[in-house]
Amino acid sequence: MTKKAKKTNSKNSKIHTGVLVLENKKVFKGIGIGYQGEATGEVCFNTSLTGYQEIISDPSYAGQIINFTFPHIGNVGTNKEDHESDKIWTKGVVFNSEITSPSNYRSFQHLDAWLKKNKIVGITGLDTRSLTNFIRDKGAPKGTIAYSKTGKFNISKLTNSTTKWTGLKNLDLAEKVTTSKNYIWKGFKTWKKETGYKKNNKSSFHVVAIDYGIKKNILRYFSDFNCKVTVVSCKTSADKILTLKPNGIFLSNGPGDPAATGKYAINIIKNLIKKNLPIFGICLGHQILALALGAKTKKMKLGHRGANHPVKNLIHDNVEITSQNHGFEVIKENLPKNIEVTHKSLFDNSIEGIRLKNKPVFSVQYHPESNPGPQDSVYLFQEFINNMKKNAKKKRS
């Protein structure tokens, strides 16, 4: 008489084809998705509910493994238009729930297939709340994410890869993600349901954007405000930038340690400030501008990443809900006297915006272009436009 096969719990019998190994040897197991392989980076978390395609394609995430705190990621698939850069620099992604079939009229490809195409290692079915709590309590750790259909992993080797990696501190990633060739932005505006990404051929001002890892939605907003934008690599000299005859300079977002990028970027910015041109910086651009003005930066314990960060505008005495993505900050102690703090975080009172007292120069730590996120701070683009208008009028008089 043959014995009946014992029923097994399908959930428990599932092979763990994905692992995340942290530097303290803590191992999280799940189901691998995307690209089969392994990748090492800093493990961070993002609290956004939407916009995963824009987040993953943001160059500022170079060198990082993103843990998404919202449980359902991938529901709307991916499309051909919403990339924030042409190349994906994110090291890996971690999701709580299995990706469902996409349901959206703009969807072109399943998120799993998109991750595979872009060689991004991912895991689903992982306890993202536990991982988030760990990061919150201990700080953002180094980690190695791996996916193998066999479910066989050399944990010792993965741990070794994790501990050997130097981390983001003192790492210049802007030089890796910056454009290899200067170019003029095509002029596409921000997305509208009725028109999609419509092209704008008008140009009232010429902005030169220094690319430390620029997001496309920043360029789209400049098109919304009738600006022609020339994007230059992060090591382009001030003299070469000035030959382009810009009305204003934009310092972009980007990944890595601002102090490391500052080794070449600070002198470029100092020379541009001397020319009294309007300057506007976002995120890494904000940090490098602060360094050029004599301030200092430091690595944060876990950083700010999400689309719901409240920021106090100290000039207008109001609160803006902002989109953020940064792991370094400007140190608020012993700021040079010529720097005025304009915005601060209502989470931890860290500096979120500065301006130079005697010149048309300002920057913010957060992302006014959102994508994803609220649009409370789009007015900053208008302030930059106003500075260029005033500067042009002054030159004519």
Where are these regions (language model features)?
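RNA-binding accessory domains that recognize and position tRNA/RNA substrates
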Residues: 2-244, 256, 273, 371-373, ...
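Short acidic-glycine loop/turn motifs at beta-strand connectors
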Residues: 22-24, 138, 314-316, 357-358
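Short clusters of small/polar residues that mark proteolytic maturation junctions
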Residues: 32-33, 70, 302, 355, ...
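Proline-centered loop/turn at the N-terminus of a beta-strand
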Residues: 121, 206, 278-280, 296, ...
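Active-site glycine-centered loops adjacent to acidic/histidine catalytic or metal-binding residues
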Residues: 127, 283, 326, 367
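Cysteine-nucleophile active-site neighborhood
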Residues: 247-321, 327-332, 373-391
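Catalytic beta-strand/loop cores that center a nucleophilic Ser/Cys/Thr
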Residues: 318-359, 366, 396-397
